[in-house]
Amino acid sequence: MNNQRKKARSTPFNMLRRERNRVSTVQQLTKRFSLGMLQGRGPLKLFMALVALPRFLTIPPTAGILKRWGTIKKSKAINDVRGCRKEIGRMLNILNRRRRTAGVIIMLIPTVMAFHLTTRNGEPHMIVSRQEKGKSLLFKTEDGVNMCTLMAIDFGELCEDTITYKCPLLRQNEPEDIDCWCNSTSTWVTYGTRTTTGEHGREKRSVALVPHVGMGLETGTETWMSSDGAWKRACRMETWILRHPGFTIMAAILAYTIGTTHFQRGLILILQTAVAPSMTMRCIGISNRDFVEGVSGGSWVDIVLEHGSCVTTMAKNKPTLDFELIKTEATQPATLRKYCIEAKLTNTTTESRCPTQGEPSLNEEQDKRFVCKHSMVDRGWGNGCGLFGKGGIVTCAMFTCKKNMEGNIVQPENLEYTIVITPHSGEEHAVGNDTGKHGKEIKITPQSSITEAELTGYGTVTMECSPRTGLDFNEIVLLQMEDKAWLVHRQWFLDLPLPWLPGADTQGSNRIQKETLVTFKNPHAKKQDVVVLGSQEGAMHTALTGATEIQMSSGNLLFTGHLKCRLRMDKLQLKGMSYSMCTGKFQIVKEIAETQHGTIVIRVQYEGDGSPCKIPLEIMDLEKRHVLGRLITVNPIVTEKDSPVNIEAEPPFGDSYIIIGVEPGQLKLHWFKKGSSIGQMFETTMRGAKRMAILGDTAWDFGSLGGVFTSIGKALHQVFGAIYGAAFSGVSWTMKILIGVIITWIGMNSRSTSLSVSLVLVGVITLYLGAMVQADSGCVVSWKNKELKCGSGIFITDNVHTWTEQYNFQPESPSKLASAMRKAHEEGICGIRSVTRLENLMWKQITPELKHILSEIEVKLTIMTGDIKGIMQAGTRSLRPQPTELKFSWETWRKAKMVPTEPHNQTFLIDGPETAECPNTNRAWNSLEVEDYGFGVFTTNIWLKLREKEDLCCDSKVMSAASKDNRAVHDDMGYWIESALNDTWKMEKASFIEVKSCHWPKSHTLWINGGLESEMIIPKSFAGPVSQHNYRPGYYTQTAGPRHLGKLEMDFDFCEGTTVVVTEDCGNRGPSLRTTTASGKLITEWCCRSSTIPPLRIKGEDGCWYGMEIRPLKEKEENLVTSLVTA
């Protein structure tokens, strides 16, 4: 083992002397010199070269170099740089002489001011291009040369997509959590972030959108009987039974009569009550074609139109018409909101503050186009702060929407329905759904719901339609995205977490919830990245699963829905009624074709002479004894010889003969129709139930089971009315009811099944016809009993004050009336004046319903209905029908019957005394007119609708005027004015239940010519007819008669216990006077100047009065009771 100590390596210190070597090695000298140069020491020229070297190599200088650079003398540094510039110039000349590009050499020069320099809020602001990435940026400031280092990794092309933030001042410390810093003063920097491919940074995730499935929106496409449909049906049955106890009892009687066991009776009753409320269920598909047959002698019929269906109407002595609803469009929808589903961000700017320096702010925060966010971030020495801690940071970016989707509100008044009407003319394609040249196209809108269509050769048909879209537009929003549209629930639409604009905002700058499409990344010390989410179109399509898609055509939106129309046929006429029957021979052009509706189409050709003529066609049984079936094409005619004619008919089930023409040459065609009459009965009943279900609560005759019975009653009246009238003429209605009850009771207790069914049927019909009052289409005068008859209800007779009235005014729709009243109140109308006392009774009956309808939509208005005393005063304004009606549900009806509404400060006065707060000049008057006569228990319902325009005339539909032999009468439901011919026509008597302020219409006035208004006994302003029949020699207009009493009897006779003499000494004409004084004393002596005897007498509730021409002879004026009225 070698124990010898190894030689120590030479060290800079002598271990014995403990001192440094006097002479340094070459390595030590080189190292010492290099470190000194990097720390800023050494010769100036060498230092200047060392400063240029990092610029060439894009290496950041050290702190020592930067310190020396700031301390050297300016003149010496400039001289050295100029000398360097001369040397570089010589090098450029040499290179230029070599005719080669010297651009590479130029890139070696330090890039001083190679960027755009500006200021921001008084501080330097660099706008840097992509070429400066990773370089030190130098520019001169008041404190000297400022060098900024930019090490950002998201450098891109300079465009509108930029990032702006502040580079902090950093001299001694190492940079921390920053990518830009400066050595002299903090500086703003802006650079672009767009890549060479033109893409922007964005997030690919989508917003969390709630699916639309399960929102429970009725859109017209739901399946009948969903999972919870059974419970809804049970609820409807319960509420219907509570609302219609009378008809429920009748249904129970029918069920008990028909059923033989308790189970059968219960099942029949449940089925009846289940069908009855089906009018509240919507969206049940109806058959492709529906046959609606009008009542004989009726002037109108109700039909239901739906897309994809055709309705054929038939009525006696009227042409057969086909109706088809071909299009329902929504135009000019109002925009509710505009949602942004794709956006971009530009001009991102960040400002930050050190701890304890307060909250940072940006001017962009005041600009509504920007989306901003405040955060906190760690700060310290490494990012320009003197203290460590949390500092504030705010980042803003300009939000621009690239793609929108809109939510629109569809108003019912913006819906337009297109209907095609085609008469069965026998020409080709004139059967079924014809939209070609034979059809007449009309358009229906809520603003013009009444439309007339001129059918060439067949007259004019009037349609009054009421839309039934099956949609609650208060809960529906129409969402449009590019060229597609959906019906969505309003609340779901309003809750979408997307940036949106109000519909009224046309500039698009004030977008709300912009942050839902923006993601702010975790902030750095001086910078925060902001990205925008990707397009949300795909996410919206996913969320819209289950929503109903709507078709669009020419920018308009196509809807489903139903149209309930009242078809008025009074102006229709059959073409060819005056033609004679065809006597020639017919030929079958094409074999009989059976349609899917149970009808047949026969195409025949006439080969005889004498055209135009009517085609004889009958369908008979095999024995050719009984005519069966019916003609769909009413009164088929031939217009030209050898021209084919189409005839549609409905043969009975089984075998039958179709006979065309007359003998000889008569065509006899055998036909067999498959099917069952009983089955067809059930099928027709189901079709009627579906038609009921489509229309909803108020649209159809079948508004309830009572409506079903009422509709059956129309047929019963037509079939059995004449027999019933003959059998029970002169019998009171109580006796009729009693007879019906007895017959029904006997039938229910009969042991014979056939006898029991027959008696029950007869009893029920007797009960129905006895209890129900049917109305015709107007009023006529009964001369025998001196009465006005409207339908079978007698109203005005000689004994007017017994009030044996059988009429009841009803509004066409309380919800429509409430809508008109709300609009009137908004326009400053404070109340209503009734035209007749029946109208006043109607207002009293429906006031609770109107109150609840208005309270449901939170209209704070109290409706108060008062009584009528004396004259029915006139107003000067009127109610106007509105395009939309208010909601009127069964809950509202039930509350109106049971729960009073809360009073409000604002009132709407109906009748009652005139007050200063609501004078007659500010009240609506004469706004209603008779729309139709209907059915009712014990009374005839008269349905009223709102007038389209103002009118001073009384409603002519409750008036009549007639003249026969030597008698004439003008009458309505409150007046009976009778005149007689005795040498000349003159008034005999008049009865008044009320005194109206409307004008008697000329259409119901006899002998208009020749009469002066000043000579009319009953003034024109009090509904006196301007006629010679309203005249009496010696008397003038009774403008100051005692009409303040209301009920009056006017005739020509002496008041009891008084005398009247004609003398020139009599007093002047004046207000009517009562024959008794205020104390009850009878004034016996009266006179007149030139009036005829007997005098004009007026009987009121307080006694007997004389006309204005009759004056007292002796009584003092202060004792007289005078009339309070001046016309």
From Swiss-Prot:
Region spans: Interaction with host EXOC1: 1-15
Keywords linked to the UniProt accession: Clathrin-mediated endocytosis of virus by host, Cleavage on pair of basic residues, Disulfide bond, Fusion of virus membrane with host endosomal membrane, Fusion of virus membrane with host membrane, Glycoprotein, Host cytoplasm, Host endoplasmic reticulum, Host membrane, Host nucleus, Host-virus interaction, Inhibition of host innate immune response by virus, Membrane, Secreted, Suppressor of RNA silencing, Transmembrane, Transmembrane helix, Viral attachment to host cell, Viral envelope protein, Viral immunoevasion, Viral nucleoprotein, Viral penetration into host cytoplasm, Virion, Virus endocytosis by host, Virus entry into host cell, Zinc
UniProt-listed CDD domains: Flavi_E_C (cd12149)
InterPro entries per UniProt: Env_glycoprot_M_flavivir, Env_glycoprot_M_sf_flavivir, Flav_gly_cen_dom_subdom1, Flavi_capsidC, Flavi_capsidC_sf, Flavi_E_Ig-like, Flavi_E_Stem/Anchor_dom, Flavi_E_Stem/Anchor_dom_sf
Region (Fusion peptide): 378-391
Superkingdom: Viruses
One of the protein's GO biological processes: clathrin-dependent endocytosis of virus by host cell
Extracellular side: 123-238, 281-725, 774-1127
Residues linked to a glycan: 183, 347, 433, 905, 982
Annotated site, Cleavage, chain positions: 100-101, 114-115, 205-206, 280-281, 775-776
Record-level GO cellular component terms: extracellular region; host cell endoplasmic reticulum membrane; host cell nucleus; host cell perinuclear region of cytoplasm; membrane; viral envelope; viral nucleocapsid; virion membrane
Propiece span(s): 101-114
Stretches the record annotates as Hydrophobic: 37-72
Disulfide bonds: 283-310, 340-401, 354-385, 372-396, 465-565, 582-613, 779-790, 830-918, 954-998, 1055-1104, 1066-1088
Molecular function in Gene Ontology: protein dimerization activity; structural molecule activity
Pfam entry (one): Flavi_E_stem
Ranges annotated as spanning the membrane: 102-122, 239-259, 266-280, 726-746, 755-773
Ranges of the Cytoplasmic topological domain: 1-101, 260-265, 747-754
Domain notes: The transmembrane domains of the small envelope protein M and envelope protein E contain an endoplasmic reticulum retention signal.
Stated name of the protein: Genome polyprotein
Organism: Dengue virus type 2 (strain China/D2-04) (DENV-2)
Source organism phylogeny: Viruses, Riboviria, Orthornavirae, Kitrinoviricota, Flasuviricetes
